[in-house]
């Protein structure tokens, strides 16, 4: 066991973890932040995406110990539980960008990162290329792609 200290959703966290503990396991099992989903455990589906130091990262591929001092934002930290939705969450809701919801946390955090990086330079091709690492079996991506061109960008 080894200690790792990082910031998760704005709160300082120190946890004793096994050297093989993945970030997704730290979030879900140690911190009980279950909004980050595990779909494939092989970096294929994107359901486990969180923001690490502001960048989208598949949390099933990163060891918790690698994140010493990092700033991690999971879907639970994107907007206050008792406050308004984040603009990207609102865009998903308004544009029907979800059905079963399993991929939604990863899709939303990927979208937040993409809009931060590309902003008004987004076009349909770029959006589709950037979403290749996020699998949704329900929506067919059409509404998800449309929401990028809504009021979020």
Pin down the residues of each PLM region.
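Active-site loops and adjacent core secondary-structure elements that bind or stabilize anionic groups
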Residues: 153
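Signature of N-terminal electron-transfer/Fe-S-associated modules in redox systems
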Residues: 1-150
